[in-house]
Amino acid sequence: MARKGILGTKLGMTQVFDENNRVVPVTVVKAGPNVVTRIRTPEQDGYSAVQLAYGEISPRKVNKPVTGQYAAAGINPRRFLAELRLDNPDAAAEYQVGQELTAEIFTDGSYVDVTGTSKGKGFAGTMKRHGFRGQGASHGAQAVHRRPGSIGGCATPARVFKGTRMAGRMGNDRVTVQNLLVHKVDTENGVLLIKGAVPGRTGGLVMVRSAVKRGEK
């Protein structure tokens, strides 16, 4: 069985009750429908993957190279295009160009990895961006309470090391949260209720895949 995955839209968070009447915080994800536009094989492309398309878009907004890809697959253009890597080269045989994928590929109680783009926070200091403790609130500290401190020696090493944590733009990064429980699959509405929070803003694009560390298929 191939590793499963689907593109979707984060609709927001809510809470539901489980069978023991306990409140469970869940993120609502509109999963699919996705269309398989291309199948990559080790013989032809050097790796095994499935290309998925999702979302509506006016054909006039799609450039000619991408329009050619959709035309070759016999599919109307979509807004988003992404590849799902397959761990087993033989798994590509389970997919066909033009095949439609919906929320039904997942089941209640399965575990997934969710990838999205985190919210942008703008320019942030080291305390917010990296969790620095800051400097003393008193005892001679004047206007340095939130400063990071030294970033390197003057004579040795006479430079700032790469990767030194400093102030800068925070957020708007690709983030993956692993091992989230699928609380419920609403096949009628094409919705996944995923326990916990997933990255990104409401209305953002997310990729939901089988949990790799749990060996989910």
From Swiss-Prot:
MF terms (GO), sorted A to Z: rRNA binding; structural constituent of ribosome
Keywords linked to the UniProt accession: Ribonucleoprotein, Ribosomal protein, RNA-binding, rRNA-binding
Coiled-coil annotated residue ranges, if any: none
Pfam families the UniProt entry points to: Ribosomal_L3 (PF00297)
Biological process annotations from GO: translation
Family matches, as PROSITE patterns: RIBOSOMAL_L3
GO annotation, cellular component aspect: cytosolic large ribosomal subunit
Family: Belongs to the universal ribosomal protein uL3 family.
Record's function text: One of the primary rRNA binding proteins, it binds directly near the 3'-end of the 23S rRNA, where it nucleates assembly of the 50S subunit.
Subunit annotation: Part of the 50S ribosomal subunit. Forms a cluster with proteins L14 and L19.
Matching PANTHER family: 50S RIBOSOMAL PROTEIN L3, LARGE RIBOSOMAL SUBUNIT PROTEIN UL3C
Protein name per the record: Large ribosomal subunit protein uL3
Species of the source: Mycolicibacterium paratuberculosis (strain ATCC BAA-968 / K-10)
Lineage: Bacteria, Bacillati, Actinomycetota, Actinomycetes, Mycobacteriales
Gene: rplC
